[in-house]
Amino acid sequence: VKGLGELERTVMEVLWAREDAGTAAATARDVSRALAGDRDLAHTTVMTVLDRLAKKGFLARERDGRAWRYRPVESREGYVTELMLGALEETGDRDKALVHFVKSVSSDEVDVLRQALAALTSKEPPA
């Protein structure tokens, strides 16, 4: 699984938040404005990060006049799932790693896992 650097993650968080809010794909200017309060980044830096993320396969882009519009290829949850599966692949014993993971989560998270497993066994999508 490809990882994200700190700045790449920050940019992805802006795009994932826009996606969560139902907002269309973003230009580099949109991302620069969203980051203006938190980070003092040059617009060219944001453009470079967006281009790099597109080349790595994290973003899709389409022309909009002279600008590019970017959108995440995968949801935040999908990305985290890939990271978790990648980490699981690195273990020598997946079963033990899964048991250890389940022991380390909260009781509310255990309930979520139970519901997801029940939905899988009954072929119903989880709520």
Region locations from a protein language model:
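Amphipathic alpha-helical dimerization/coiled-coil segments
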Residues: E82-K123
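Short alpha-helical segments that sit at the start of domains
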Residues: V1-V14, R18, S75
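Short, hydrophobic-biased segments on the C-terminal half of alpha helices
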Residues: M47-D51
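Glycine-centered, phosphate/nucleic-acid-interacting loop/turn motifs that mediate DNA/RNA or nucleotide
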Residues: G57
